[in-house]
UniProtKB/Swiss-Prot annotation:
Pfam families: Cytidylate_kin (PF02224)
Protein name (Swiss-Prot/TrEMBL): Cytidylate kinase
GO biological process: nucleobase-containing small molecule interconversion; pyrimidine nucleotide metabolic process
Intracellular or extracellular location(s): Cytoplasm
Keyword Transferase: yes
Family of this protein: Belongs to the cytidylate kinase family. Type 1 subfamily.
EC number annotated for this UniProt entry: 2.7.4.25
Signal peptide from the UniProt entry: none
InterPro entries: Cytidylate_kin (IPR003136), Cytidylate_kinase_dom (IPR011994), P-loop_NTPase (IPR027417)
Upper classification of the organism: Bacteria, Bacillati, Bacillota, Bacilli, Lactobacillales
Catalytic class of the enzyme: transferase
């Protein structure tokens, strides 16, 4: 049976990662959290106080402490920078609020996209992000673009933060998500947009199971036809 490449794109908190992880597990595919890679680069910049004028230093740190993914005992995915487990720290609000400017740096994107394509070569992979279908995997057999209202996405982020013990204000989250939407869709390098051949799916009011079922059925149909 052919193993395909699945690209899931969409704005912040549209449910990409949650859905991608479930589908990867169901299909026995590899899940690559590209957002965690950009968050890791952002964490480096913030930890060292680097600005957008010091891209070479961020890349140097990435080379010294490469990003890797490992499985935890419960099956969840852990993110490492060198030997440091950064799974939780890269989800903190300061990283979330700065990831847009770091991910907009051409040199950072070029390096991480190169890493992502190398991992995806064999197929049997599902990636989620902002530009997977348009830039990273333009040859993906299935491209999905998830959207949802700002209100719904803020609600999801608020619940996620509660579960992780991160304090947050609902109204502030709404403002931050709207601001990030604008930044992501207006940046010069790889702006957030749906690929021409992507299936656009509005997840507002749709359960996670409903979104998973929609994407998985499309994937299985493509595999059956190949």
């Amino acid at each position: 049976m052919k193993a395909i490449k699945i690209a899931i794109d969409g704005p912040a908190s549209s449910g990409k990662s949650t859905v991608a992880k479930i589908i990867a597990k169901n299909l026995g595919y590899t899940y690559l959290d590209t957002g965690a890679m950009y968050r890791s680069a952002t964490y480096i910049a913030l930890t060292h106080g680097y600005t957008d004028k010091e891209v070479a230093l961020i890349l140097e740190e990435l080379e010294k402490n490469p990003i890797s993914f490992k499985k935890a005992k419960d099956g969840s995915q852990l993110v490492f920078l060198g030997d440091e487990d950064v799974t939780l720290v890269i989800r903190q609000n300061d990283v979330t609020n700065n990831v847009s400017w770091v991910s907009a740096l051409p040199e950072i994107r070029e390096e991480l996209v190169h890493q992502q394509r190398r991992i995806a070569q064999a197929g049997g992979i599902i990636m989620d992000g902002r530009d997977i279908g348009t830039v990273v995997l333009p040859d993906a057999e299935l491209k999905i673009f998830l959207v949802a209202s700002v209100e719904e996405r803020a609600e999801r982020r608020y619940k996620e933060n509660l579960e992780k013990g991160i304090e947050s204000d609902f109204e502030t989250l709404k403002e931050e998500i709207a601001a990030r939407d604008y930044k992501d869709s207006h940046r010069k390098v790889s702006p957030l947009k749906a690929a021409e051949d992507a299936l656009i799916f509005d997840t507002t009011g749709v359960s996670i199971d409903g979104v998973v079922q929609f994407i998985q059925e499309k994937a299985e149909k493509i595999v059956d036809m190949s």
